Amino acid sequence: MKLRLILAAVIAAMLPLSLSAQDDNSKEQTSKEKKEIIKTGYNLGPLPAVAFDADKGFQLGALLNIYDFGDGSTYPNPRQHWYFEASFFTKGSQLFVISYDNKTLIPGIRWSSAITLTNDKAMDFYGFNGYRAHYNHDAVALGKDKQNPDNFIYTPKYRVNRIALLAKTDFVGNIWDKKLFWEAGYHFSYFKQGYENKQALNLAKINKNKDPEKVFPETEEPIFDLYRKWGIISEDEAWGGINSTVRLGLLYDTRDKEGAPSRGIWAEGHLMLAPKWLGTTNPYYRYSLTFRHYVPIIKNDVLTFAYRLNYEGTFGNKAPYYVLPYITTVGQSYDRDGMGGYRTIRGIMRNRVQGLDMASYNVELRWRFVNFSLWNQNIAFGLNVFSDGTMVTKEYDMSFKGDEKYRAEYDAYMAEGLDKDRPHITLGGGLRFIMNQNFIVAFEYGMPVSKFSKDPMIKNQDGNGAFYINTGFLF
């Protein structure tokens, strides 16, 4: 009883408002497999968005989930789902999201659409090809040391301003036995990098209110500006552009449920076609392969082993740099950037690993240590341990194409990195609050293995680790 009171207090603090529009009879239904309330009708979850991401800072804002479970026959999967979010981060980012997913409006077709706007005043940019691009961890650490005021804040060295507008509409239809599906969609995106005065950052804003000795000097160029000067990033694509993309794919899905699966396979293969004639500024053609597997060790969602394998590839040897840090999605989700960060490789710095081709994995052991019903809601708490990893398998061209007077500094920079990338691996764990199998709040911490490496070329190259408060499962 005491434990339940404590948990009730925690839930009340985390979920200040949860509304359900359904009849009284539906509240009494329970599933045969385990005691669980079958949700019907509309379930609304307006919440303050208070979270933390080591890459973006504290998040303040609001979000709204609307789930339509209809007569309950599809529970725990909703018939349709709306999601709205407006968030502001203390490190200078803003995020606005509207997404909609519907399984019944078009007979036999799942329709998903989303529009997102991200404004990053100082987005992480560490260069290309993983460990080939050296990260000066010591200078960053000294700049943050309040006991050593003689070193300026070095973090802007690895930042660039970016505005990203993404819109998409996807359709998924059955091919065989509601397990094999076709996928097709149109994705539009607009990226604006840097500023019109041709530099990565607005240093006046970056240095505002800083002590004079901590000001990032104008003579210290960010990596993004150095890459332009050396010709690694061409002026034709440096400042962003438009992507007009058709996505085609196949999906194999045998999951028992979508929000928090405990058994089944979820595998996808996608083609991304962005030709010039469709309006793309810098045309490219890419592909993506993803395999996810959920293995029940103890039934009824108690203990689950889950893993994801992903490969993001490029046809040919050219793709605009601003499309590289994404794991491709088609369907109810939407693209999120950062090979490194909560949605990709937990524990390493956001966008740390970028290349034309990248392989990654995520492995988790998920344990739900308590399940109960409270206030007509299905509540669960879970723990997980994980390991994530990624590596560049086809490099972005980092050859020198600039003015010869800059070659010496380019050679010195390249000499600091490795001759090729190696696996970036992290370990970590976390706690999850799960309501009605769909609304999930996650608290996780990831630590890069490179932090403990004895090789000075690798040690601390992925950062110090990161703590996240976010929503959902990674996969």
Per-region residue spans from a language model:
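Transmembrane beta-barrel strands of outer-membrane/channel proteins
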Residues: V50-F52, A62-I66, W82-F88, S113-K121, ...
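C-terminal outer-membrane beta-barrel translocator/porin domains of Gram-negative envelope proteins
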Residues: D236, V246-G249, K257-Q377, T393-E395, ...
